[in-house]
Amino acid sequence: MTQLSLFYQFPIQPIFEGHVRNTLICTEEDMQQLQNLGIRKLRKEKEEIQKNKILKNLLKTELDVLQAHVQTECQKLNTNLRDIENALLLENQKIIPSSETHSVLEESLQAKTVTQVTITQIDPAIHFTENFRPEMIKTFYNNTQMWSYTFGAWFYKLKRAFFTDSKLKRMLKLTYVDSLSITQELLSISINALEQITIYPMHDNLVSDLEAGLCLLTAFFASYPGTFLTENIKFVDVIQNLSQIFRYLNTEILATKNASPQDFYFGFNDPDKMKYFIPLCKGRHYAINTFSNHILIKIFIKKGVIKQVPGDQMSKGHVVIESKLTGTLTDDKLLYWTQILLQPKLGKEVPIFVHQQQYLRSGIVAIESLYLLWQILNSESIFGKRTGKFYLTTIFPHVNAEDVTETEFSSVNIQNFEFLMKNYVVPTYLANNESTISTLFPGLISIVVNESVRLGWDHNQNTLTQTNALHSQTKDNPFVEYIRSQLEETAELAVLEKHDKILFHFENGLNVTLSLALPRHRLFAMASSLFNVADLYDFLYFLVLGFIPVATVI
């Protein structure tokens, strides 16, 4: 029972009522401490503000000084540039008439973006911007919607080899295995494989095979009195005078052959089971006597181009090359001319060919390639009666008859080789100074390699070539293996081994072809049976393009 609530009490009683003694008492000492603490805090904040203000003033002063210095230096630079521009303008006005200045500037700007090459003397020039061969392939396929073309038995065999692999078949867009035509993808990757053969995939490969060969030829040509060589010579000058140099070289080769027929050998004595082109003995040296039997090495030693190849014993009685490096530079002809030709490109990093022997070997192979072309291309006139079915209009349908001229016609003085060097090799090298034999002449690679493969030669069982010996053959195409390894992204060493296998076939094919009395007939027969080549006109374009399309009826 609840208690009775009184009438004067509230319904809800407050909780926690304040105590009567709950009061805050601050003494005077406490108030003084609080006041001092506040004063110190305010003084600290004021000092911090003054410090930041001083730092900002100092930074502004330093920036003003820096700005004034930069303006002064920029004014000096502008003044110097203005003086240089005025001097160049005065010099150009002395050299170029004012009426021709505009056209010369236009030509120089165009030369930076467009390169012009000419293959034969009866055709107009061809312009390209970056990559000559891919642009030709693209142009050809853009203009062939109404026709079907065949490229020869070799490309058709490539198509059949890849057609059985479903993955590669999709990648290369192969259809209709019975059709002789091939896709743009297959042609492009095949030509790309041909272009890579003499490009060695090394990060420290400073000199192309073409440049190495030109250095060797320059040193050889310098051994004759009364030559045109000066210390201002460039690679372009050597290329334009290759015909004259090869006349001297041909005389030496024939003299060596007549004196000792067994010395007429253009090959290398590699040890058995050698897989890679790069030398592995003592740094960058090949095995002993690798160069001993090569006729060009014997000629170079005879003419004093090189004193002795390290590790070889074929030049007894000569001092070793190391002793020559301590003497005057002009005593070593090869090193002297190599430095003159390569110094604008490499500076002081010019390699010594007899010590980094991959340059010596690749240069010799490049000389053999150009020498073979010199023997073949001037065998007949380009203006003779044609038997082939390929014309430039196959790639460029809109070529007019007026574009085909015969202004350089000469019935006695045939200069197909000289014309090709001047109007194709020179502008291509100027556009890309890393050009090699395979990038210049992929067609030559395919013919020579197929000649070596046809003979059944095997680099792993390398012996001196015997003309009276027959070799068994296999159906293996080294290009099929190389292209497949690239498409399937095989390990780098495996791809390199297949690449070098083709390179060794190319070396052996050159040895076999140059050893023949009439190399032209052998190469033309091979090109005719595999690549649709019927005459010299076809052969010239096949050397450069790597393919000859001929219209076919389905």
UniProtKB/Swiss-Prot annotation:
The gene is CVC2. The keyword S-adenosyl-L-methionine does not apply. Heterodimerizes with CVC1. Interacts with major capsid protein/MCP and triplex capsid protein 1/TRX1 at the pentamer vertices. Interacts with the large tegument protein/LTP. Residues 1-46 are annotated as: Interaction with major capsid protein/MCP. GO terms for biological process: symbiont entry into host cell; viral genome packaging; viral penetration into host nucleus. It comes from Human herpesvirus 7 (strain JI) (HHV-7). Capsid vertex-specific component that plays a role during viral DNA encapsidation, assuring correct genome cleavage and presumably stabilizing capsids that contain full-length viral genomes. Participates in the interaction between the capsid and the tegument through interaction with the large tegument protein/LTP. This is Capsid vertex component 2. Belongs to the herpesviridae CVC2 protein family. GO terms for cellular component: host cell; host cell nucleus; viral capsid. Keywords: Capsid protein, Host nucleus, Host-virus interaction, Viral genome packaging, Viral penetration into host nucleus, Viral release from host cell, Virion, Virus entry into host cell. The keyword Nuclease does not apply. The lineage of its organism: Viruses, Duplodnaviria, Heunggongvirae, Peploviricota, Herviviricetes. Transmembrane segments: none annotated. It is found in: Virion; Host nucleus. Its main location: virion. It comes from the Viruses.
